[in-house]
Amino acid sequence: MEGTDVRMSGQDVQRGTFVQRHAVLHDHLTDDEWSPLQHLSDHQGKLRIYNSLLSEYGVIGFEYGYSVERPDSMVVWEAQFGDFANGAQTIIDEFVSSSEQKWGQRSSLVLLLPHGYEGQGPDHSSARIERYLQLCAENNMTVAVPSTPASYFHLLRRHAQHRPYKPLVVISPKQLLRLKAASSSIEDFTEGSFQPVIGDRSGVTPAQVERVVFVSGRLYYDLEAERAKRGDTKTAIVSVEQLYPLPEAEVKAQLDLYSNATDIVWAQDEPANQGQWPFMALNLLPIIDYRMRLVSRPASASPAAGTGKRHAAEAEALMKQVFEG
């Protein structure tokens, strides 16, 4: 609508892996295709959306090159599941994360990596957030985990307008696509802007808060539901929407708001050696005057449990560790 061309590719992106997009409609009698999003305004940019071949390495490499040559376009690659991007790790290491530092070559490529610990097993749960955060330095790219539709929208809109161009890694939702609690009003889209940190949404009284839980992504909604179930009015839950560049001022502002709190928590679904914590332990802890405890799954060689029963037990243990210490 604002004149930015959008090019999107990936495996099953026209429909969406989770049957959530339906960006291209197919006539099964004539084989004609029609995309409603191409007909919103007479002055809109062009939308090109392609179902790509099953080669992450080849496709991300091509889209990276396209984004370099067309930096004014929003060039997006979406994984079916976030961990499928590991097939293109060479491109991510050699080009996406480091080309500006090595050669002064800038890219505006967007990677959408569906992520979420929802009981789907080791190969469909983790986008390997820790790997992207390990590559972050010198303001080389943005890594974000939007937790609401409006946050997702404002993140992409900001990226389209941002100069100089930088890659954007979005740890995108799965379960949240259909979770009623993860919704936004029309006003949330038409007003405001992307917020790197979203403060507590429950209306807790800051002076009465004894525990502040920082979280990023899907786990926020589990924590919110558990807090309501317990009738807890002394815990504030803060959503960190942008992981890099680390929003230091916004995090400190939340800590200052709850100055009476004595229990500061970083909560994550991922094992202790994965997810956001290794990055936060290195970059966040040294700049805050608080002791922060980690609540996570135990360190693991595998990203996630292989059985639904074990997954459920781990999720229950996380809630107890957060609210009972």
What are these regions (language model features)?
Residues 45, 139-140, 233, 290:
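A short helix-to-beta-strand connector/capping loop
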Residues 9, 75, 110-112, 144, ...:
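Hydrophobic/aromatic beta-strand patches that form the interior of the parallel beta-sheet core
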Residues 105-106, 116-130, 177-325:
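Thiamine diphosphate
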Residues 1-72, 77-100, 186-238:
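Non-catalytic terminal/interface segments that mediate subunit docking, oligomerization
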Residues 3, 70, 136-139, 163, ...:
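A structural signal for short coil/turn segments at secondary-structure junctions
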Residues 20-21, 157, 305-307:
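Short secondary-structure transition/capping segments
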Residues 64, 74, 79-199, 273-283, ...:
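Phosphate/diphosphate-binding loops
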Residues 11-13, 52, 79-80, 113-116, ...:
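Fold-independent oxyanion-binding glycine-rich loops
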